[in-house]
Amino acid sequence: MASATRVIQKLRNWASGQDLQAKLQLRYQEIAKRTQPPPKLPVGPSHKLSNNYYCTRDGRREVVPPSIIMSSQKALVSGKAAESSAMAATEKKAVTPAPPMKRWELSKDQPYL
């Protein structure tokens, strides 16, 4: 249709009842638009769009050693003497979710297992 003369174009438009030439440039409406909205990135080490160098957006650099939440041993504060052993004996033990498991024993009747 693009190579048809104006007379043929007018004849085609009149026969079809619509302007066929106006539709040529918009025949693919599912094509993405030229201006795209900025991306919506989740907040994280690389959530900034600019001024975001590779060394600062690398998540491995934000990893730190694990912090001790609870310890069964009491840590001594520097500059203070150790407290009495009676105080250490009354210290509470860590709470466990279940009683300790019994030690497994090997079967006596089948020594090959």
UniProtKB/Swiss-Prot annotation:
| Keywords linked to the UniProt accession | Acetylation, Electron transport, Membrane, Mitochondrion, Mitochondrion inner membrane, Phosphoprotein, Respiratory chain, Transport
TM segments?
none
Query: How is this protein situated with respect to the membrane?
Result: Peripheral membrane protein
Cellular compartment(s): Mitochondrion inner membrane
Kindly give the Pfam families that the UniProt entry links to this protein: CI-B14_5a
Query: Keyword Acetylation on this protein?
Result: yes
The GO biological-process annotations, alphabetized, read as: aerobic respiration; ATP synthesis coupled electron transport; proton motive force-driven mitochondrial ATP synthesis
Please give the residue ranges the record annotates as the region Disordered. 80-113
- Modified residue Phosphothreonine is at which positions? T96
Its main localization is mitochondrion
One GO cellular component from the entry? respiratory chain complex I
Q: Which domain of life does the protein's organism represent?
A: Eukaryota
PTM annotation (N-acetylalanine): residues: A2
Subunit annotation: Complex I is composed of 45 different subunits.
The UniProt function text for this chain reads: Accessory subunit of the mitochondrial membrane respiratory chain NADH dehydrogenase (Complex I), that is believed not to be involved in catalysis. Complex I functions in the transfer of electrons from NADH to the respiratory chain. The immediate electron acceptor for the enzyme is believed to be ubiquinone.
Q: Which family does it belong to?
A: Belongs to the complex I NDUFA7 subunit family.
User: What is the protein named?
Assistant: NADH dehydrogenase [ubiquinone] 1 alpha subcomplex subunit 7
Q: Which organism is it from?
A: Mus musculus (Mouse)
Q: Which gene encodes it?
A: Ndufa7
